[in-house]
């Protein structure tokens, strides 16, 4: 989403080594869904800034799939940085509104926040981008 890209750009302008990748089609035209994803990413990035300010790399990845969106915020774990569980409850509450979940923890030497949010996609119009040509 363009709001998420703008959020990443603001962190980049603040000097953070951050990149953004959007996979798949744009998100549904649902302002609440888009805001939920934005807020989860914002909280995860704020935690990186607070607890791992010396990280060498941050990746924000958003993937649109049929009936769901997946969000990853991954940072190279800074040596000795404390666990970043602050704000996790709020992120989980936001995701739960969309039958989703949030997980956070170390993955392959990095710290990863992963969120999945779900919605019903059952009309031909909503699914046409997934149908073979």
Question: What feature does the model see in each segment?
Answer:
Residues 44, 91:
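Conserved phosphate/oxyanion-binding catalytic-loop motifs
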Residues 67-70, 77-79, 107-114:
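Glycine-rich nucleotide-binding loop
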Residues 20-41:
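Conserved short strand/loop->alpha-helix "switch" segment adjacent to the catalytic nucleotide/phosphoryl-transfer site
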Residues 48-49:
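Short helix-loop "hinge" at the ATP-lid/N-box region of the Bergerat-fold HATPase_c
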Residues 57-67, 72-75:
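Short beta-strand/loop element within the Bergerat-fold HATPase_c
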Residues 94-133:
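Flexible, glycine-/charge-rich segments associated with ATP-binding catalytic modules
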Residues 71-89:
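Glycine-rich/acidic phosphate-handling loop/turn and adjacent ATP-lid/helix
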Residues 1-16:
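Short beta-to-alpha transition helix within the HATPase_c
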């Amino acid at each position: 989403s363009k709001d998420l890209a703008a959020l990443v750009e603001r962190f980049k302008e603040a000097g953070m080594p951050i990149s953004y990748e959007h996979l798949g089609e744009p998100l549904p035209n649902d302002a609440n869904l888009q805001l939920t994803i934005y807020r989860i990413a914002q909280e995860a990035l704020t935690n990186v800034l607070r607890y791992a300010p010396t990280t060498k790399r941050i990746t924000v990845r958003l993937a649109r799939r049929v009936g769901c969106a997946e969000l990853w915020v991954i940072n190279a774990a800074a040596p000795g940085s404390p666990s970043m569980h602050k704000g996790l409850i709020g992120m989980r509450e936001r995701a739960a509104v969309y039958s989703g979940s949030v997980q956070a923890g170390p993955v392959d030497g990095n710290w990863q926040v992963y969120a999945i949010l779900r919605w019903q996609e059952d009309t031909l119009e909503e699914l046409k981008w997934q149908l073979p040509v």
